[in-house]
Amino acid sequence: FYLMLPFYKLFPHVETLEVLQIWVVFSAVIPLKLLLSKLNLSKLANILTILWFVLLPVLTTAGGYHLHENCFLVPLIFWVFYFIVNEKKWGILISTILLLLVKEDAFIYVFSIGIFFLTQKRFNLTNKTKKWLVITEFLLPLLYFTLAMYLLSAFGEGGMVSRFDAFLLKDENGVLTVFKNLILHPSFAISHLFMAKKLGYLFLMLAPMCFLPLLQ
């Protein structure tokens, strides 16, 4: 949000923040365009991909509610992808750190990116890059999350565990308990993931992407 401060100083209005939030989200077009240039797709495919991106409802409604730090996730995730595909060591590190700094639970996104690139066969990454990914996409986010939770507990009101209430049993609390239930009680966790309401939500999220994530 400090990146928005100079603009808000010049134009101290609520509308300024809303416009800036939209610009931040759609700045992801830059790393997306750079990433597409590495995929050797046809010109038409590149145009359609960018068009799909800018028309995706979940992005076009980014400024429809209120100012939220999640607006920084979209461009930063694309930058992490771009630097990994190009095997830019320091680019991977810097973009990953910036992504983690958005929020304490951003480590989930970083973990997911790391798992994808270490298991996929689309990009031929060198062993050196894969080792670097283990450090930046697994060890670093784990250390960051541990430190962030400590600081939030010691100097704040703790992490926002309430969003994980579905994975907590009666009278339970804490992030560690969530992880414990995911490991020791997987059927309990799965039963809460695949409820009718949530399956409907997944359908609405995947339909605009033609269910392509399920093919990976």
Question: PLM features: what roles do these ranges have?
Answer:
Residues K130-Q216:
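Membrane-lumen/periplasm interface segments of specific transmembrane helices
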Residues F78-F83, W90-F117:
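Membrane-interface alpha helices of multi-pass inner-membrane proteins
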Residues Y109-L142:
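Perimembrane helix-loop-helix junctions
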Residues K38-N40, E69-F72, I77-G91, L118-L125:
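Membrane-interface transmembrane helices that cradle and orient dolichyl/undecaprenyl
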Residues A62-N70:
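Short acidic/glycine- and proline-prone juxtamembrane loop motifs at membrane-interface regions
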Residues W23-L55, V74-P75, W90-I94:
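Transmembrane-helix signature of polytopic, membrane-embedded enzymes
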Residues H13-T16, L39-I47, N86-I92, T129-K131, ...:
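Membrane-helix interface segments
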Residues F1-L5, L10-I30, I50:
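Loop-to-helix entry region of an early transmembrane alpha helix in multi-pass inner-membrane enzymes
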